[in-house]
Amino acid sequence: MEVIVIGSGVIGLTSAWYLAKEGHTVTVIDRQDSSGKETSFANAGQISYGYSSPWAAPGIPLKAMKWLTQEHAPLKVKPSLSPELVAWATKMLANCNEAKYAMNKSRMLRVANFSRECLTHLRTSEDLAYEGRQKGTLQVFRSEKQLDAIQQDMKLLTESGIEHSLFDVDQCLSVESGLADVKDKLVGGLYLPHDETGDCHQFCLTLTEKAKQLGVRFVFDTEVVSLNHQNRAIETITTTQGEFKADAYVVASGSYSRELLKQVDLSIPVYPVKGYSLTLPIVNVDKSPTSTVMDETYKVAMTRFDDRIRIAGTAELAGFDYLIPEKRKATIDMVIKDLFPQAGDFSKAEYWTGLRPMTPDGTPIIGKTPIKNLFTNTGHGTLGWTMACGSGKILASVVSGSASDIKSDDLSIHRYL
């Protein structure tokens, strides 16, 4: 079959890769001049299988109200509430109970765990270089209340077969010795030994070249204008470079998937949740993270690459806005200076912002749509890098009509229709 994939971020690329591996003729179309230039460009760098959790959780509505009044809170909401945001937030609030949280987290862990297997195989078989490390994630807690709250997550991790350990402060220092000078600020941590790190943009560029060797065609600097459909099927797509025709079409356009799918009367609850990152060159290796350290209080991740640190966090509900206010810079600055004050060179700081495509239940939307030759792979939120390889392989199986390696029928758009 001929398949067109719309989007060359990490989700579109892994979709294209696994489709090509199944023997399809694949064309990837993207509006940027190369792969991974939007949400995949400077994300947190953490590949956190065990940290795969929905934001819609018990207690979040109350926490959100408190966060809105705090200077360095992990959540920000722009004053003007659009109808799309109100509808999305309403659905999210409906998922903030114990039963739905457990169901959603279980689904997310299923995809994430499968993705770990897929990435391991892909990295090994193709010898991919992306500054990858397999040294785990340490989620650090600053209060006893946070330690108590993590018990429910640990139960779900156990049920999903994901190895984890609750650490005291000394054990935290055994895996992240760079925290030694600030140990009095911590009460413990959750260690996930099988989590990984890596530069997502480097991965995208490397996989693009590998995909070309499989025969995948890339069409850059080209924006999809319309999906032309008749009799519940896509016939062609119109782009800024003319029309393209295929047997099947995959929408993997992140936060922009929602607008594309509106053209075929499909409404998906994917909202752009804005996040910020800071990249610093390392000046003191001994005072830097070894892998990923996640500050539970501020929801900020600090990830080690070869000679850089990537600090990322904040969830801002502001629509399709790419401005970087000084206040947002101040929050991620504050966290890295608080926990790893001697690690990086702030005179060479690089700031970035991206839009994470978030669903109300946290689970991505992968699979068939009511349009018979149209498929989706979107809605991964902050976990696109974590879930990319597994999601791409699931998507390829669905398009091919073959059995998926894991249960995937509850991942499609149909759960929202």
Swiss-Prot record:
Domain of life: Bacteria
Pfam families to which the protein is assigned, alphabetical: DAO
Annotated GO biological process: D-alanine catabolic process
Catalytic activity: a D-alpha-amino acid + A + H2O = a 2-oxocarboxylate + AH2 + NH4(+)
Keyword terms, alphabetized: FAD, Flavoprotein, Oxidoreductase
GO molecular function (one): D-amino-acid dehydrogenase activity
Binding site residues for FAD: 3-17
Pathway in which the depicted protein is active: Amino-acid degradation; D-alanine degradation; NH(3) and pyruvate from D-alanine: step 1/1
One Gene Ontology term, aspect cellular component: cytoplasm
Cofactor(s) essential for the protein: FAD
EC number: 1.4.99.-
EC supergroup of this enzyme: oxidoreductase
InterPro entries: DadA, FAD-dep_OxRdtase, FAD/NAD-bd_sf
Function: Oxidative deamination of D-amino acids.
Similarity field: Belongs to the DadA oxidoreductase family.
Name of the protein in question: D-amino acid dehydrogenase
Gene: dadA
